[in-house]
Curated annotation (Swiss-Prot):
Subunit description: Homodimer.
Binding positions (ATP): 47-54, 161, 190, 212
Known function: Catalyzes the ATP-dependent amidation of deamido-NAD to form NAD. Uses ammonia as a nitrogen source.
Binding site for Mg(2+): 53, 166
UniProt-recorded name of the protein: NH(3)-dependent NAD(+) synthetase
Organism: Lactobacillus gasseri (strain ATCC 33323 / DSM 20243 / BCRC 14619 / CIP 102991 / JCM 1131 / KCTC 3163 / NCIMB 11718 / NCTC 13722 / AM63)
GO molecular function term, any single one: metal ion binding
Superkingdom to which the source organism belongs: Bacteria
Keyword annotations: ATP-binding, Ligase, Magnesium, Metal-binding, NAD, Nucleotide-binding
Catalytic activity, reaction form: deamido-NAD(+) + NH4(+) + ATP = AMP + diphosphate + NAD(+) + H(+)
Length: 277
């Protein structure tokens, strides 16, 4: 095993193989324990895109909330799923299918187009130029602003979808989809999440679709694997301690090093990861 590979695996807590049922139970118990330790919290809020990660996370949240209601007799516990399109969502049918699979207590739709466009307009009025990439990050951050607003209105916590196959590369927006109160998928790679959805009886098309962040208007439906320069199979193999090609390993390690700043939020005077040896 490559030296850096061992370090990354240890940081991400990825197991070489999993029992899907055990990992489902582990995530549900984690979500329940957090509520028990924070009795002022009565809801979980999650943005639903229709992709694998939010579909799985949402299902786990609903299962945890239902168990909390049954165990405590407190019907105020709620899971709130939020669809957050920018204008018209290209894969809106997948998001609807994810909601149907999860059966959340509340299903909200908040269109972020107006606030995002307003933000771009007021910033560009100062003479600044907002690129398409920058605007994509504004979309991600606006979605999180909405989720925290809803959580604040419902004594809730915002749940994130971050997992090992994204975290290693920082494939998320700082203070956007990377912001959350807790992340029940942390420790899992992409294929492990897929195995858990299969175990839960999820519609096949929701975990077999090509993952895409879909933030940039100039690059609609850009697959994650194209953006990353490496396939999720290669990433999963690497995180599970298997051998991958030299090219794939170098790209994975390059992404890890380049995204280190996202795993130190904010950077403090005691951090030195950014200094070149």
């Amino acid at each position: 095993m490559r030296p850096l590979q061992e370090k990354i695996i240890a940081y991400e807590h990825v197991l070489p193989e999993i029992d899907p049922q055990k990992e489902i139970r582990k995530s549900i118990d984690f979500l329940k324990d957090y509520l028990k330790e924070n009795p002022f919290l009565k809801s979980y809020v999650l943005g639903i895109s229709g992709g694998q990660d939010s579909t799985l996370t949402g299902k786990l949240c609903q299962m945890a909330i239902e168990e909390m209601r049954e165990e405590t007799g407190d019907d105020s516990y709620q899971f709130i799923a939020v669809r957050l399109p920018y204008g018209v969502q290209a894969d809106a049918s997948d998001a609807a299918d994810a909601i149907a699979f999860q059966k959340p207590d509340q299903d909200l739709i908040v269109n972020i187009k107006d606030p995002v466009d307003a933000m771009v307009k007021v910033v560009e009025a100062t003479g600044q130029k907002i690129t398409d990439f920058n605007k994509g990050n504004i979309k991600a951050r606006q979605r999180m602003v909405v989720q925290y607003a809803i959580a604040g209105a419902n004594n809730g916590a915002v749940v994130g979808t971050d997992h090992a196959a994204e975290n290693f590369s920082g494939f998320y927006t700082k203070y956007g989809d990377g912001a959350a109160d807790l992340t029940p998928l942390f420790r899992l790679d992409k294929r492990q999440g897929k195995a858990m959805l299969k175990e839960l009886g999820c519609p096949k098309h929701l975990y077999e679709k090509a993952p895409t962040a879909d933030l940039e208007e100039e690059k609609p439906d850009l697959p994650d694997e194209v953006a990353l320069g490496v396939t999720y199979k290669e990433v999963d193999d690497y995180l599970e301690g298997k051998e991958v090609s030299e090219k794939a390993a170098e790209q994975i390690e390059k992404l890890w090093k380049k995204s280190e700043h996202k795993r130190h939020l904010p950077v403090t005077i005691f951090d030195d990861f950014y200094k070149k040896n």
